[in-house]
C-alpha cells in the first residue's frame, strides 16, 4: 500500500475538506444565480408586452433562417441581433421598474432616464431589423420570383 501523500502535516485533510466545501458553495451560488436570471426572464415575459413581441419576432427570424438555409455567418448575426434586442429590452424594463420604485410621480429626470432606455431598445431593434433585412430580403425576393 502506498503511503499517504505528505502535504505539510496532518492539516491537509482539513484544507482539502474546506476546498471541497467552498467548491460546493460556489456551485450552489452559481445555481442560484441562474435561477435568479431565469426568474428575470420569466418576469419580463409575463409582464412586458414588448418583450413578448421581441420574442415572437425572434422566433420568426429563426424560422426564416431555417427555411432559407442561411449561412453560419448569417446565423451568427441573427443570433447576436436577437440576444442584443432582448437584452436591451430587459435592461430597459429593469431601469423602468427601478425608476418607478425611486419615484412614482412623473419627474423630469426620471422621464429622461426612461426615454433614454427606451431609445436604446429602439436603436437595437432598428439596427437588428436592418441587418435582418439585408440577410433575408434577397432570399425572399428570389423565392417570390420562383412562384
Regions found by a protein language model. Give the residues of each.
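Transmembrane alpha-helical segments of integral membrane proteins
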Residues: 92-108
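Glycine-biased, low-complexity coil/linker segments
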Residues: 8-9
Amino acid at each position: 500500500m502506498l503511503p499517504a501523500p505528505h502535504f505539510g502535516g496532518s492539516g491537509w485533510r482539513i484544507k482539502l475538506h474546506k476546498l471541497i466545501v467552498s467548491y460546493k458553495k460556489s456551485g450552489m451560488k452559481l445555481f442560484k444565480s441562474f435561477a435568479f436570471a431565469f426568474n428575470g426572464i420569466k418576469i419580463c415575459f409575463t409582464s412586458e408586452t414588448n418583450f413578448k413581441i421581441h420574442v415572437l419576432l425572434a422566433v420568426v427570424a429563426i424560422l426564416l433562417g431555417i427555411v432559407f438555409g442561411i449561412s453560419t455567418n448569417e446565423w451568427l448575426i441573427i443570433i447576436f441581433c436577437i440576444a442584443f434586442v432582448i437584452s436591451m429590452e430587459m435592461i430597459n424594463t429593469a431601469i423602468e421598474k427601478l425608476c418607478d420604485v425611486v419615484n412614482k410621480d412623473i419627474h423630469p429626470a426620471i422621464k429622461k432616464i426612461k426615454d433614454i432606455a427606451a431609445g436604446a431598445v429602439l436603436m437595437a431593434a432598428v439596427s437588428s431589423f436592418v441587418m435582418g433585412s439585408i440577410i433575408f430580403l434577397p432570399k425572399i425576393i428570389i423565392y417570390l420570383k420562383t412562384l
